[in-house]
Amino acid sequence: MTDFRTHPDPSEWNDYVDYESTSWPKKDRRSYWIIPSICFNCESACGIIAYVDKQTLQVRKIEGNPVHPGSRGRTCAKGVVTPNQLEDPDRILYPLKREGPRGSGEWKRVTWDEALTDIAGRIRQAIVEDRRHELMYHVGRPGEDGYVNRVLQAWGVDGHNSHTNVCSSSARLGHFLWTGADRPSPDHANARTILLLSSHLESGHYFNPHAQRIIEGKSRGATLIVVDPRLSNTSAKADLWLPAKPGSEGALLLAIARYLVETGKYNREFVRRWVNWETYLEASWPELPRTFEGFEIALKQEYELFTPEYAEIETGIPAERIREAAEAIAAAGTAFSTHSWRAAASGHLWGWQITRCLYLLVVLMGAIGERGGVNLHHTNKFVPRPYNPPPPPEYWNELLFPKEFPLAFFEMSFLLPHFLKEGRGRVDTYFTRVYNPLWTNPDGFTWMEVLQDESKIGCHVALTPIWSETAWFSDYVLPMGLGTERHDTMSQETHAGRWLGFRQPVRRVAMQKQGKAVGTTYEANPGEVWEEAEFWIALSWKIDPDGRLGIRKYFESPYRPGEKITLDEYFGWMFENSVPGLPDAAARENLTPLQFMRKYGAFQVDAVAYSKAHEQPVESGGVEIDGVRVAGFNTPSRKLEFVSMTLAEWGWPEHAIPRYVPGQVYWRDLDRDADEFDLLPNFRLPTLIHTRSPVKWLYEISHDNPLWISTEDAARLGVAAGDLVKVRTAIGYFVTRAWVTEGLCSGVVAMSHHLGRWRLHEDRGGARAASSLVTIRRKGDGKYEMRQIHGAMPFKSDDPDSARVWWSDVGVHQNLTFPVQPDPVSGMHCWHQRVRVEKADRDDRYGDVFVDTEESHRLYKEWMAKTRPAPGPDGTRRPMWFDRPLRPVPDAYKV
């Protein structure tokens, strides 16, 4: 009988033989090294294996790594296209330096040493002159755990900026206020009921590993409940689809919570033991007895409004469906899993309260740390300790965490251009790494204005594997490696286990297998494409060549004192000293830990891991539960905080418990007679990811982002499928095509945020198969018009497929027309927009965009007025128990 296998066995990876498909029917045997790495095209950290041709060293194919515990041999379309990225005719292969004005498109090739010397000189001068606060590193999806934070700490710089506040900060805050952990880790595979507040099955965080386990759980009989105003592919898989009106999810969740409490179908003993109900009664219900029975009375009165019938009015979901969902959750018991990352939480003002309401259901069911329930992320994510950790920064960077946002999760990154326009500071040296704020963030033309202003940003260094709209406005474009061209460690909370993955430059590894000496990764990669891990070491030595600044010592070898560390030494030390079980596993195969990770690309730290740390007995600290002192949760009360006294003490007492609070686009406030809609602009496609995926195979699948509009609304507007429509926002408009569907709530329009890439030059500045050529005309007073000249077209290159590009549409860039809308508590940009939709005018063309940046800045000030600034009750900038990247010394918290 034939032995069918999905992957070659690791024992074959050093010399795998396959037939060359392009030689068929001739049997042309080719030999490959199969070298594992980690995909770099989202944050799931899925394992991949690269088939490296032994003759040409070309990466011929990418598949999933079968020994990777998170992804288990599977990869999505974004992983498979890695060879497209490697061979992209429009990728950047050599370091470039700007010659003309920023944005002019005039570049010259420079050496790595020239770039390092210039950039290091600026940084050294800023450090010597005590201007560390003018150094900033701004990253999108990092694809690594902790390496660059260590670099910034070594420099003494509080300069880590991120994309979190256009991604997940409201969900993070909602989770953190409950447990002291800002991310959940659902055990979908073993759940009896799974509740998703998004199209999580097809495009969520973490897409591939979670999708596998959701379907696994469903195949074992789990009930899948999906709350999504769109009939997404996830909704289509649901046993119960609940298309709630956007922003009303809190009403739905509280109705379910009320039902569970009223019927007694909740885990009463867990709630009694682990929720800070005593504090809640003392603060809000002094007239009730300080007993759990008193808390139950208070809870029922607190949420008495939220009957299924009330929720039906608010959400549009029939009351019977709400009861059905509640019964499914009750039936699951502790095997109830759920997840919230973006979607509703990221879309709305007070979106973190939606997450608070969602987690209330987890708490009521006692599903924390249980099989089929929800873990805390740090139970399942493993971050190894590096050698010689530097001390924390000694100051607080107000451009990252301004006083107005003491509770933000995390840096107020998308407000940076407005802060600089207001004169709050200046950035001397600004690194963007795999981050494209001009395109990804709202209000991109304000970013463009600031990026062109050298008085606000002295030097912009774009660390990027590809061209982007933002890189076009930089001083240096430094090409960095993709998923098979770089070193990183990475782990994610994908399931109820713990693992560590290792990304590595596969051509470098292959050359070393050939016996060739490779000094730096750019000697092995195409052109002179480098990797950040080596780049930061080289740059740090340039900044502090003699060690007098106290920086160089953190980049010296732990094995060769005084000499520059190599990446083999950096990761070798980590794998030898910081990964439990790895040295023993390696020794069983007569390998070093580094050799083991190079061979397999991943290591399973724990096969099964559930969050039980809160139950561990302790001698001091912690919290007393039924007469036993235990560790508890990482909150001030050491309990699950139904009532957050932090919120109450830091100026938000009305939000101290989970509440339903309508957001900035409330369906009752829309003027439907004036054709106002709620624009849902933040849903994702399973084939694309922000700005890393403009490659031929993906865009052949997904290359347009029409405006979803319900059949009912389209008929009222007189719009048919394919018609041009103009969508007016608070600061401008964009023109796109309508897609008429029954799969969307009335009063809502929706548009995927992945597409609409553009470039300003015909043959550089963007992927020609995935971007449109545009003109941008400044009309004065902050007004800009963008018009597409043409979309994707066939073109000649070394890749014969470039002449076969058959699609022309590459979508419309909607984010340019969105004002910044920061949630005053979490700092999250609230993505949903109140818009007016109309048929396009005669002179309108597909892809037209108009923006008024002066109006945008005025609206920025309106939203800033909603904040309640620090200091808090203890005179600090931020609660000491709150997480933040690059946490400074305690004295820096003082205002």
Go through each PLM region and give its residues.
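Surface-exposed loop and adjacent secondary-structure segments within mature catalytic domains
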Residues: S185, V383-E398
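Non-catalytic alpha/beta scaffold blocks inside enzyme catalytic domains
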Residues: S170-W350, T355, M365-E370, H378-T379, ...
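Long, low-complexity segments enriched in small/aliphatic residues
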Residues: Q353, P561-V695, L886, Y893
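A short, sequence-level motif marking secondary-structure junctions
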Residues: N65-H68, L647-E649, A738-C745
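Short Gly/Pro-enriched turn/cap motifs at secondary-structure boundaries
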Residues: R30, S37-N41, G351, A631, ...
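Short helix-loop-beta junction
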Residues: Q153-D158, V363-L364, D453
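A residue-level signal for beta-strand positions that form part of recognition/binding surfaces
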Residues: Y32, V59, G73, E134, ...
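N-terminal export/assembly segments and adjacent metallocofactor-ligating motifs
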Residues: M1-Y266, E293, E309, P318, ...
